[in-house]
Amino acid sequence: MRLSDFDFALPEGLVAQAPVTPRDASRLMVLAPGEGAPAHRGFADLPELLAPGDLLVFNDTRVIPARLLGHKASGGKVELLLCEPLEGGLGRRWRAMGQASKPIREGAVLTFDGLEARVDGVEGEGFYRVTLDRQGPELEAALGRAGRIPLPPYIRRAPDAEDAARYQTIWARAPGSAAAPTAGLHFTEPLLARLAARGIRRTAVTLHVGPGTFLPIRGDDLDLHRMHGERYEVSPAAAEELAATRARGGRIVAVGTTSVRTLESAWRDGAVAAGPGRTELFIRPGHPFHAVDAMVTNFHLPRSTLLVLVCAFGGQGRVLAAYREAVARGYRFFSYGDAMLVLRR
């Protein structure tokens, strides 16, 4: 399977540079089961498009100010992006991406406005293992002072005060992500209330978003691509809610590709298993979906693992045709853009 089969032309002007207000004022393309044409709705219409007894599954990770600009002991400039908490949450040990004018060596001490990071290991391809000099609330305060919101590079502006709130879901709880689970950015408290009033339930899993989600695929052969690992957790309460929904005949509606990957990664012996894990699952056409019946997702980059996942879920030809229609109709793309609801049943 070739990466070039997952390409499409996207005018630069359709890349959303800022969010809409309110969050649920974005547009929503709907791909229903079968081969019918896409429907075009507003995101606020979501309660009408789901059924009582369906279960929305959110990713409750919280984006941290993970981009750090500082210097080495020599005075040279250095940049780190904290990518993966190796101890869970805001611990001391992290996997990070780094760059500097000269190689970053094992044992180097990097300083970021008072926050220090010791380089414990060099993994190659710009990845490092680092130990920070604080954890928990002290680390959170230090990141608030020294770090920046890690907006994606296709948002061609510096992050501002609005991004601190808007590049975060309203239910974000567990700190640890270097990017937002963007399908969740469309939800508002009034929309959640309307969903609940219709009998649509919700639960949450946690996947800390890192390079496995946002790094590009190198090379054209998808079979050679290896995902970077990302840590996830499914609580016992979430696992019970998922099983109960299936038993009642309700649909599991994953909000975002990270929720899809969490649920599919945690599938064991006919059910989603509770507990922590680390996933390197690369979902591509041919994947046998077990845990997910529908998904809410944004419009993704050409030639990305995220687009490949959506094509696996909704059908490659149908999804790519829908993307071409989205371009023709002026949908907004990527993190701050519009959304798609893909239903398998």
UniProtKB/Swiss-Prot annotation:
From what superkingdom does this record's organism come? Bacteria
InterPro entries assigned: QueA (IPR003699), QueA_dom1 (IPR042118), QueA_dom2 (IPR042119), QueA_sf (IPR036100)
- SUPFAM superfamilies listed in its UniProt record: QueA-like
Annotated localization: Cytoplasm
Among the GO biological process terms of this entry, one is:
tRNA wobble guanine modification
Q: Does the keyword Cell division apply?
A: no
Q: What EC numbers are recorded for this enzyme?
A: 2.4.99.17
Question: What is a single cellular component term in the Gene Ontology annotation?
Answer: cytoplasm
Q: Which reaction does it catalyse?
A: 7-aminomethyl-7-carbaguanosine(34) in tRNA + S-adenosyl-L-methionine = epoxyqueuosine(34) in tRNA + adenine + L-methionine + 2 H(+)
Q: Name one GO molecular function term.
A: S-adenosylmethionine:tRNA ribosyltransferase-isomerase activity
- Tell me the pathway: tRNA modification; tRNA-queuosine biosynthesis
Protein keywords: Cytoplasm, Queuosine biosynthesis, S-adenosyl-L-methionine, Transferase
**Described purpose of this protein according to its UniProt entry:** Transfers and isomerizes the ribose moiety from AdoMet to the 7-aminomethyl group of 7-deazaguanine (preQ1-tRNA) to give epoxyqueuosine (oQ-tRNA).
In which family does this protein belong, per the annotation?
Answer: Belongs to the QueA family.
- Matches recorded under PANTHER family: S-ADENOSYLMETHIONINE:TRNA RIBOSYLTRANSFERASE-ISOMERASE
Q: How does it assemble?
A: Monomer.
In Swiss-Prot or TrEMBL terms, this protein is called S-adenosylmethionine:tRNA ribosyltransferase-isomerase
UniProt lists the gene as queA
